[in-house]
């Protein structure tokens, strides 16, 4: 089964330069004059026993003003990491070029608006587009601030994909993250406002119910975009909702 791992990485204006109207908003984009966490993620991938996958680094700037600087910074980081996997950089300029080709082929403007790196849902959809372009049978979606500790991560992520389990074919699976205490809860410092909006408590309760109970593979009402594997039959038919700018804040 052909596999493509896609890692979106988010880059903002230089340190000290304020956010400007129209800039995309992400949790923690890295200023283009800093290193960020991407290299740490790539270096941790060296422990994989299996590197039989194509890697796409999706360079997502918060503004067109930093596109070139972000791409240059990511290129330096990838070369320095020395991962040894077949790696592609996918930039906003590449996406515009693809949009131009599709426009010339007759794709209407409404559909072309979906080709955007602005906002989390659009970024995730471009991740799926990259996997489709590389004819992947499975897309492994990862975040740029993760550290891999299991050398068999790829095998685990692919274990059930395309197989029939409990009478149904598995077209998508999602994993979870461990915090600094080796727990699956959010690693957050308690704040007074949490007394009145206990979203982390609600998430913890949901995590206990889904992650903390057997069996290992089960249906779930939520998933983590940065620990997700999707089969081609799913990701070429079902996109992320482009009208939802975020994911984790939708409902508690």
Where are these regions (language model features)?
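Acidic donor-binding loop at a coil-to-helix junction in glycosyltransferase catalytic cores
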Residues: 245-252
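Short beta-strand-to-loop element that shapes/binds the nucleotide-sugar donor at the catalytic cleft/hinge
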Residues: 168-191
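N-proximal low-complexity "stem/linker" segments adjacent to membrane-targeting elements
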Residues: 1-73
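Short, well-ordered alpha-helical scaffold segment located
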Residues: 233-234
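Short beta-strand-to-loop acidic/aromatic patch adjacent to the donor-nucleotide binding site
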Residues: 136-149
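A recurrent flexible, glycine/aromatic-enriched loop bordering the glycosyltransferase active site
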Residues: 209-229
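Active-site-proximal specificity loops/subdomain of glycosyltransferases
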Residues: 70, 74-130, 134
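Conserved donor-nucleotide/metal-binding helix-loop-beta segment in metal-dependent transferases, i.e.
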Residues: 149-172
């Amino acid at each position: 089964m052909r596999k493509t791992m896609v890692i979106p990485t988010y880059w903002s204006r230089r340190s000290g330069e304020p956010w400007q109207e129209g800039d995309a908003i992400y949790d923690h984009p890295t200023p283009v004059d800093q290193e960020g966490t991407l290299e740490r993620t790539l270096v941790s991938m060296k422990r994989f026993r299996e590197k039989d996958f194509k890697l796409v680094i999706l360079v997502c700037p918060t503004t067109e003003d930093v596109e070139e600087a972000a791409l240059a910074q990511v290129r330096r980081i990838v070369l320095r990491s020395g991962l040894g996997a077949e790696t592609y950089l996918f930039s906003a300029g590449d996406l515009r070029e693809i949009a131009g080709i599709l426009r010339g082929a007759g794709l209407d403007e409404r559909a072309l608006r979906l080709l955007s790196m602005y906002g989390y849902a659009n970024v995730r959809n471009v991740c799926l587009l990259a996997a489709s372009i590389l004819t992947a049978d499975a897309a492994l979606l990862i975040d740029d601030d993760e550290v891999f500790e299991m050398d068999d991560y790829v095998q685990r992520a692919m274990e059930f994909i395309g197989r029939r389990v409990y009478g149904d074919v598995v077209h998508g699976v999602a994993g979870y993250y461990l915090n600094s205490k080796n727990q699956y809860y959010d690693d957050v410092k308690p704040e007074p406002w949490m007394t009145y909006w206990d979203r982390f408590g609600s998430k913890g309760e949901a995590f206990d119910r889904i992650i903390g109970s057997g069996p290992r593979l089960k249906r779930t009402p939520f998933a983590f975009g940065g620990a997700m594997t999707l089969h081609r039959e799913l990701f070429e038919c079902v996109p992320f909702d482009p009208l939802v700018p975020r994911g984790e804040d939708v409902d508690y």
